Every structure is written in structure tokens, then in C-alpha cells.
A protein has these predicted regions:
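Short, solvent-exposed positions on alpha-helices
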Residues: 9, 97, 120-121
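Alpha-helix C-capping/helix-to-loop hinge sites
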Residues: 25, 87-88, 109, 114
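Amphipathic alpha-helical linker/stalk segments
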Residues: 5-38
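A short secondary-structure junction motif
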Residues: 10-21, 49, 53, 80, ...
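Amphipathic C-terminal alpha-helical segment
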Residues: 96-117, 132-135
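Amphipathic alpha-helical packing segments from all-alpha helical-bundle domains
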Residues: 36-40, 44-57, 62-97, 124-134
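Phosphate-coordinating loops and pocket residues in cytosolic domains that bind phosphorylated ligands
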Residues: 8, 58, 113
Length: 135
């Protein structure tokens, strides 16, 4: 359909920009510093793609392409997180899964839209949750 073509085009553009924005090597000297960098990059990218992801969400249930697009993005985000974390955290399944959830687009979008937090407030909330989880 025309809508599917439109969303496919939009989705590919978002994915390209998203991956470019997150694929630069992380420069932090410790895994904690690299994790902070990763969080910063995600937040910057999430803020950019939010209007598109919200529009896409309304149509996703009717589009296999958009469903697979979401899965691809989540897999990519998860793999980036795995590369940053030490084995002790990767092996702790519940901590890793909670961290993956906290740093997802869905968490960011809920903080921004449903809980009406500013970008700075949402960032602080996520950083505090991550710090508490990793303490």
C-alpha cells in the first residue's frame, strides 16, 4: 500500500540516521564512561526520531516491515549494550534485561510523553535508575 511504502521509506531513513549516530567508537576509558557515552548518544537519537517512531507505532500492527524494523532496532541497541558492559553484568540476566529495558526507546518515550518530563529530567531519571541498578 501507499502507507506501507511511506512508512518503509521513513523507517529506513530513521534507521540509517540512528545507526550513524550510534556507530562512532566510544572513547571512554572505563566501561562506566563508555556506558554514559552510549546513554548520551541514545538520548540524542531518541529525541530526534521520537515524532517518527510515534507516527510509526500507530501503523506498526498492520505492517510486517515495521514490526521487523522495530525488532532490528531493538536487536541493534541490545548488541551495542552488550559490547559496553563487563561480563559480570552481561551474565546477570535480570540486571541485564532491566538495563536493556531502561535504555530502550519505549522507556524514553514514556518518560517524555506519558510522564511529561523534560529531556533533562528524563535523562536524570534514567541515569539515577541505571546507577541504582549497577551499584
Amino acid at each position: 500500500s501507499d502507507m506501507d511504502s511511506l512508512y518503509r521509506e521513513m523507517s529506513l531513513t530513521i534507521e540509517t540516521q540512528f545507526i550513524q549516530g550510534l556507530s562512532e567508537p566510544l572513547t571512554g576509558e572505563t566501561w562506566q564512561a563508555r556506558l554514559r557515552e552510549l546513554i548520551d548518544r541514545r538520548i540524542t537519537n531518541f529525541e530526534t526520531i521520537t515524532p517518527f517512531k510515534r507516527a510509526e507505532a500507530a501503523y506498526r500492527h498492520r505492517s510486517r516491515f515495521l514490526q521487523s524494523d522495530l525488532q532490528r532496532m531493538n536487536t541493534w541497541l541490545r548488541e551495542a549494550l552488550i559490547r559496553v558492559l563487563p561480563e559480570s553484568i552481561r551474565q546477570d540476566a535480570s540486571r541485564f534485561e532491566i538495563l536493556d529495558l531502561l535504555l530502550s526507546f519505549e522507556s524514553w518515550d514514556r518518560l517524555r510523553r506519558d510522564q511529561a518530563l523534560s529531556p533533562d529530567q528524563a535523562r536524570e531519571a534514567l541515569e539515577r535508575a541505571v546507577d541504582a541498578l549497577l551499584a
